[in-house]
Amino acid sequence: MIIWVKEVADRVTVKKVRAFVNNDAIIEPFVDMEAVGPEDCIIVSKTDNAIPSSFFVNAVIVYEDVFEAVTKNILEEVAYNYDYYYLKNALSASQNENIDTIITGSSYGIFGIDCKQLPSAVNLSLISQDMFYSIKGIYKACTLNKNIRNIVLCCSYYFFYSDLSKTQNPGELQRISKVYHPLYGDMHNCKLLPPKRNILFSSNIFDIDGIVDLYAKGKYEKSYFGNEYSRRDYATRIWEDKSKDWSELNEIEREQAGIRRAALHNKNNRWKAAFNENKQLFHELSCFCMSRDIELLVVVVPATKYYRTALCKEFREDFFEVLNEADGIVGLLDLFEEPSFSDGDFNDMDHLSESGAEKLTSAIAELLQLPVYSRP
């Protein structure tokens, strides 16, 4: 099949079309109908008033209509699979030889770190990411980049009880379908993984996958949050009036929200099998880092007093058991009760706001002696 392009200056050209079609496609400028075969197609512009009726014996594609449809499809795809494209591009960025620090963990790493301020770091954290998939990202990044010298694991005390693959929440399980299984090919302990919803068009002409990858890469700016997605949008609003921000809640509302949030996490302490598996995984990670002369730093992120006082005390004891029994060398920055973080530094009960992220990022950079972008 040959793709014939009826060129219109500054609108539709062979060069423009070539950027969007499959690499093996044959593209030629249209000259006359005699060269057009029965399986060929012709791309035209809706602004071209000189399209003979004989064109429509063949497959005719109106460039503007296809461009609009594909653009809409790609925007929908990236919005639906935002986490997948974020992590895919973060892993790609980790291959850069200037990157020597990998930051990872759950949502605490996403909310708590501003990697735009750390030119030598990449953040592989994601919302609801557990120990297993955090380590998957670490190993992949270190395989792709031998210059990695620091691993920063952002978490809370209950982290070693987490296992995303055993969740009873279908929406959370979809994270494996949409993100981790496509990237790592691993379902972990999940026995029945729900299918990933397919949004992208299929085409034997247009390189849809290449276009969406190019678009998503252009949106990646080292940070999960930006103009379209803010920390405020992702606040865990388990208080009564969802229209309120954390900063607008009164003392009673904050206390109630903190208790509810901690109660959700306290349920995790029944997952002893997950704890034992994560304990072994962390031990292996510490040995891996030590064998490669990589500094492993565990950061317990700050939390509000409303959440801290309600969190199960057993988590802290078990957390330190894991760290103390690891054979490798493990650094610890425990800021769980750090008083320099005020209520204004939080987005909700246990996630940092922009000001809180700036403080935590600076603390980690200072400890690891990482270069920091100076603000204008």
Question: Where are each of the predicted segments found?
Answer:
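Membrane-embedded segments
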Residues: 103-104, 108-187
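Secreted/periplasmic serine-hydrolase-like ester/acetyl group-modifying domain
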Residues: 170-284
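Short, charged N-terminal beta->alpha structural module
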Residues: 1-29, 71-79, 109-117, 122
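A short, well-structured beta->alpha microelement
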Residues: 18-37, 86-87, 132-133
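Active-site segments of SGNH/GDSL-like serine hydrolases
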Residues: 285-311
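C-terminal regions of proteins
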Residues: 310-376
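Phosphate-bearing ligand-interacting subdomains
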Residues: 30-72
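Membrane/wall-proximal cationic-aromatic binding patches
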Residues: 65-119, 123, 133-140
